[in-house]
Amino acid sequence: RATEKSVKTNGPLKQKQTTFSAKKVTEKTVKAKSSVPASDDNYPEIEKFFPFNPLDFESFDLPEEHQIAHLPLNGVPLMVLREERELEQLLHLGPPSPLNMPSPPWESDVLQSPSSILSTL
């Protein structure tokens, strides 16, 4: 019976202690919230220092004068350049001419006989 009495007396005391500590916690959070300074009022010049527009960094479109959607590009092969040197050679070729054009490596010589073509494969 002594254990029953101690349990009965300890039960309400524990409840009072938990509510008391909960009040302390809420008081601490209220104090913490009131002590935080408002960021907009104290530092307005910082936001003007670095102008930032996130839309500037998310635009992947070409300007209107460089749009290529209206061009018929069906059948145009994709050019994959292995080195920067090949790109520089393409840029410095000038206007295309059938006499000066080097033959692409994927085209075979038209004058070759079929047997020589098969032997190279």
Swiss-Prot record:
<feature type="short sequence motif" description="TEK-box 1">
    <location>
        <begin position="3"/>
        <end position="5"/>
    </location>
</feature>
<keyword id="KW-0597">Phosphoprotein</keyword>
<keyword id="KW-0159">Chromosome partition</keyword>
<feature type="short sequence motif" description="SH3-binding">
    <location>
        <begin position="95"/>
        <end position="105"/>
    </location>
</feature>
<dbReference type="GO" id="GO:0045143">
    <property type="term" value="P:homologous chromosome segregation"/>
</dbReference>
<feature type="compositionally biased region" description="Pro residues">
    <location>
        <begin position="95"/>
        <end position="105"/>
    </location>
</feature>
<comment type="subunit">
    <text>Interacts with the caspase-like ESPL1, and prevents its protease activity probably by covering its active site. Interacts with p53/TP53 and blocks its activity probably by blocking its binding to DNA. Interacts with the Ku 70 kDa subunit of ds-DNA kinase. Interacts with PTTG1IP. Interacts with RPS10 and DNAJA1.</text>
</comment>
<feature type="compositionally biased region" description="Polar residues">
    <location>
        <begin position="110"/>
        <end position="121"/>
    </location>
</feature>
<dbReference type="GO" id="GO:0006281">
    <property type="term" value="P:DNA repair"/>
</dbReference>
<feature type="region of interest" description="Disordered">
    <location>
        <begin position="93"/>
        <end position="121"/>
    </location>
</feature>
<comment type="similarity">
    <text>Belongs to the securin family.</text>
</comment>
<keyword id="KW-0498">Mitosis</keyword>
<keyword id="KW-0963">Cytoplasm</keyword>
<comment type="function">
    <text>Regulatory protein, which plays a central role in chromosome stability, in the p53/TP53 pathway, and DNA repair. Probably acts by blocking the action of key proteins. During the mitosis, it blocks Separase/ESPL1 function, preventing the proteolysis of the cohesin complex and the subsequent segregation of the chromosomes. At the onset of anaphase, it is ubiquitinated, conducting to its destruction and to the liberation of ESPL1. Its function is however not limited to a blocking activity, since it is required to activate ESPL1.</text>
</comment>
<keyword id="KW-0131">Cell cycle</keyword>
<keyword id="KW-0132">Cell division</keyword>
<feature type="region of interest" description="Disordered">
    <location>
        <begin position="1"/>
        <end position="24"/>
    </location>
</feature>
<keyword id="KW-0234">DNA repair</keyword>
<dbReference type="InterPro" id="IPR006940">
    <property type="entry name" value="Securin_separation_inhibitor"/>
</dbReference>
<keyword id="KW-0227">DNA damage</keyword>
<dbReference type="GO" id="GO:0051276">
    <property type="term" value="P:chromosome organization"/>
</dbReference>
<keyword id="KW-0832">Ubl conjugation</keyword>
<keyword id="KW-0677">Repeat</keyword>
<dbReference type="GO" id="GO:0017124">
    <property type="term" value="F:SH3 domain binding"/>
</dbReference>
<dbReference type="Pfam" id="PF04856">
    <property type="entry name" value="Securin"/>
</dbReference>
<feature type="short sequence motif" description="TEK-box 2">
    <location>
        <begin position="26"/>
        <end position="28"/>
    </location>
</feature>
<protein>
    <recommendedName>
        <fullName>Securin</fullName>
    </recommendedName>
</protein>
<feature type="modified residue" description="Phosphoserine; by CDK1">
    <location>
        <position position="97"/>
    </location>
</feature>
<dbReference type="GO" id="GO:0051301">
    <property type="term" value="P:cell division"/>
</dbReference>
<keyword id="KW-0656">Proto-oncogene</keyword>
<keyword id="KW-0729">SH3-binding</keyword>
<dbReference type="GO" id="GO:0005634">
    <property type="term" value="C:nucleus"/>
</dbReference>
<keyword id="KW-0539">Nucleus</keyword>
<dbReference type="GO" id="GO:0005737">
    <property type="term" value="C:cytoplasm"/>
</dbReference>
